[in-house]
A protein has these predicted regions:
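Carbohydrate-binding/catalytic loop surfaces
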Residues: 25-30, 93-102, 140-148, 182-196, ...
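A common structural microfeature
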Residues: 9-11, 26, 37, 44, ...
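Non-catalytic C-terminal accessory modules of carbohydrate-active enzymes
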Residues: 289-434
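Extreme N-terminal leader/anchor segments
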Residues: 1-28
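A short coil-to-beta-strand element that immediately follows conserved catalytic motifs
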Residues: 7-8, 63-64, 386-387, 418
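Aromatic-lined, polymer-binding surfaces characteristic
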Residues: 35-220
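Short, charged low-complexity linear motifs
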Residues: 22-36, 82
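Carbohydrate-active enzyme catalytic cores, enriched for enzymes
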Residues: 181-346, 409-413
């Protein structure tokens, strides 16, 4: 889906975010005609994992993946140190891991030029950390610094490892809530982070033989949270920025169990490669069945009610984001989604892009969610209706005033009826409360 299988007059087709673009060698990695997020996806080299999985599962490269070495060479030659999207700390974090996995898994990629480039990127990332930002970006930085520093010997590599090890342990205690959810309250980013942590745990164990207790604790909590929010259709709630960009919940849970219970995976590409150190294959049991009629995630601020007749009701009645990090927040306080046998009956719009555009503005607003809306009538016909947003989202990753949650309670009555209640203070300055 990323690198399409046609070579058209020396043009190579990449497709990210439902947007197809034609590239030629040498590639313009920072082409201003592409959106920044599209360029970021190009720089991640996440798309190379599809090639790597094929190579591991079939002991041969696919036709398209023969371009991989050319693309890595092209990146090194045409991305000057510190210039362009390729040297953004987030893109470096993802690319470091992907290149390391390629080199570690495929001897034909093990050459000094690639190793030198990886070390240079690690050192740059160590000097340009996103610790000021926090959230998933900071976790991605730390995970990559840990994996990267483990590949090298020497005083600096050891210093990077020790620093990142301590910081990640500390940061997980901050970012992982008591109920196991990630503080940014996005199911898709939760699953992405969980996959990264599992991969980190496997790599640490492969190289050092150790299994950090704090890492296992975080993985267990996050896995249990993922199981608890799984819907009948196998998907997850769309609250906040939760596009379907991560692996399915069941796949992530099985990956987690393979690490926690030390069993090998079959035909899973790089995931099976990382679990080869274990002596036996494990079960592919569906871990999503142990769900309650009422799932209450008070720290995350979500409740899910599951009825015997196939209905599922999702209710968001808690804070939408950390105060300092509204990048993935939506104005969806007290939002309700309803499913019947896995099919949406009442559903929010979701997230289609991260661009600075009217679609992004709409998808973050109350109008794109199933919530009560309050507006002030315009003074004249020329003025627009002034909708009051509980979360005043703006730009593509910003938010101003944020309503405070006043009440969030729920329960089950003796007759089995489930009740949910929540309120916020967004309208109190107008003499109203919802």
């Amino acid at each position: 889906n990323y690198l399409l299988n046609k070579k058209i007059k020396n043009k190579f087709v990449f497709k990210f975010l439902n947007q197809k673009e034609y590239l030629t060698f040498p590639i313009d990695w920072n082409n201003p005609n592409f959106t920044q997020l599209w360029r970021f996806n190009l720089h991640y080299f996440d798309w190379a994992r599809d090639f790597l999985d094929y190579r591991i599962n079939n002991l041969a490269w696919s036709k398209d993946s023969r371009l991989l070495k050319i693309l890595i060479d092209d990146w090194i030659e045409n991305n000057q140190l510190g210039k362009g999207d390729g040297w953004h700390s987030y893109t470096i974090s993802l690319r470091i891991r992907n290149w390391i996995l390629i080199i570690r898994s495929c001897p034909e990629f093990d050459n000094q030029k690639y190793i030198d480039s990886i070390w240079l990127q690690i050192c740059w990332l160590y000097s340009h950390k996103e610790d000021y930002l926090g959230g998933n970006h900071w976790l991605e930085n730390l995970i990559s610094l840990l994996i990267g520093s483990l590949q090298f010997e020497g005083e600096k590599a050891e210093r990077i490892f020790q620093y990142s090890f301590k910081e990640l342990e500390k940061e997980l205690k901050v970012q992982i809530l008591k109920d196991g959810g990630h503080q940014e309250r996005s199911a898709s980013y939760h699953l992405l982070i969980l996959e990264r942590l599992i991969e980190l745990g496997l790599i640490i164990e492969n190289i050092t033989g150790s299994r950090p207790a704090w890492l296992i604790e975080a993985i267990i909590k996050m896995t249990n949270w993922a199981i608890s929010i799984r819907l009948k259709n196998g998907n997850y709630p769309l609250f906040n920025d939760s596009p379907q960009i991560s692996s399915p919940i069941d796949e992530v849970v099985i990956y987690s169990r393979s690490y926690l219970n030390r069993f090998k995976l079959q035909k899973k590409g790089i995931k099976s490669k990382l679990t080869e150190m274990y002596s036996k294959y494990g079960t592919t049991k569906d871990y999503s069945q142990s769900q309650n009629k009422l799932t209450s995630l008070f720290d995350t601020g979500w409740s899910i009610v599951r009825y015997d007749n196939g209905f599922e009701l999702l209710f968001k009645f808690g804070d939408t984001c950390p105060k300092h990090l509204p990048a993935h927040a939506h104005s969806d306080l007290l939002s309700i989604d309803i499913f019947k046998n896995g099919k949406p009956i009442i559903l929010e719009t979701g997230t289609s892009n991260y661009g600075l555009n009217t679609t992004r503005e709409y998808e973050r607003s109350s109008a794109a969610h199933n919530v009560f809306q309050l507006a002030l009538l315009p003074i004249s016909k020329k003025q627009k209706i002034n909708w009051i947003e509980p979360i005043e989202t703006w730009g593509n990753f910003r938010a101003a005033r944020k309503a405070k949650i006043i009440k969030k309670i729920n329960g089950i009555r003796p007759n089995g009826i489930v009740w949910l209640q929540g309120s916020h203070d967004a309208y109190e300055r107008f003499g109203a409360r919802y």
